[in-house]
Amino acid sequence: AAKTKSVPICGLKTVAEEGAGFAGFAISGMGMEPHGPDFMARGDLSTLTPVPWQPGYGRVVCVGHVDGKPHPFDSRYVLQQQVQRLQDKGWTLNTGLEPEFNLMRRDEQGKLQLVDPSDNLDKPCYDYKGLSRSRVFLERLTEALQAVDFEVYQIDHEDANGQFEINYTYSDALTSADRFTFFRMAAGEIANDLGMICSFMPKPDPKRAGNGMHFHLSISSAENKNLFHDASDPSGMGLSKLAYHFAAGLLAHGPALCAFAAPTVNSYKRLVVGNSLSGATWAPAFIAFGANNRSAMVRVPYGRLEFRLPDAGCNPYLVSAAIIAAGLDGIDRELEIDHVCNENLYSLSLEQIAERGIKTLPQ
């Protein structure tokens, strides 16, 4: 969850130059003790935006400093370090994130229920009625995102009841992570104002598709050329050798990437082998690579990669950093893709999966 302090406008300069002080021991995962120095959240003023659902407020993203230096446990700083590795090569990782979420409420007994009890189809994906009945929340969230320069281009009902996805254009990895953090804040607050709960829980219903957050990936040059694209690719996937090596790095580190992309116990209910009531989980259970194959961990929309492992409960900074580290390892070692899987992995038995040399993700 995002941590914050409210600062009057007169204190903004101090936050940018010195930082707002936190007791680091009170923030989980910072590796600090109660007798240690303060954790100083130093604001990056380039990220300053209004908070559309709270008139008169603004938001600025910070990086933690301890003793005047960036704190190595700060996840945004972790990503900045990996981004620098790319910049040293003249590259930028572009990521397009696809957050999925459920709209719920509590009944009189305190039990979680769908906001829309009529959203009960076995195959609700792209359902018009379900989308229309939730339009007030979706419109308010979209307007809030657009007010801070998100280019929202489509909204749809997903494959679980009460599940939706909002798509917005890609950006560099650091900006994308900042934006998704803002997205979760906006969705939660706007839902609360409407008496709803917006849940990014990876698998709220064991019988339904879970909430993923697929990462679309490409590397661009200093001239903004997509270095993952090669029209001469004989496979027809439009990928360069660089892209294949990067993808092979993701596959090689698939189990380890779960620690970042699937960070909770509930995450592994989403990655389970098997199907949902609709016939597909839309989540990968196998370490596989395929052309437009949504049952694989790495899918190839023409000329780029889609990493389907992450769920919507992840830390986007850590996932992005891990993606860069794994991909660069694949590039540095010139790893190759052993097998292109163009089959529906949901329909194969575990024996058939093993025969193809495909490994299973941690379960």
Regions found by a protein language model. Name each.
Residues 1-155, 176, 319, 353-363:
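ATP/Mg2+-dependent ligation/transfer catalytic cores
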Residues 1-5, 37, 58-60, 97-99, ...:
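Structural beta-strand/beta-sheet cores of well-ordered domains, especially the beta-sheet scaffolds
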Residues 63-68, 123-127, 166-173, 301-309:
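Glycine- and acidic
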Residues 76-83, 138, 184-185, 243, ...:
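Short, hydrophobic/amphipathic alpha-helical packing segments
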Residues 94-105, 114-128, 148-168, 198-218, ...:
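Core alpha/beta catalytic barrel or barrel-like domain that forms the active/cofactor pocket
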Residues 129-134, 138-152, 166-173, 184-200, ...:
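Accessory "access/gating" subregions that flank catalytic or transport cores
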Residues 170-182, 205-206:
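Active-site neighborhood of thiol-dependent amide/isopeptide-bond enzymes
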Residues 182, 189-190, 196-197, 220-363:
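Catalytic-core signal marking the mid-to-C-terminal active-site face
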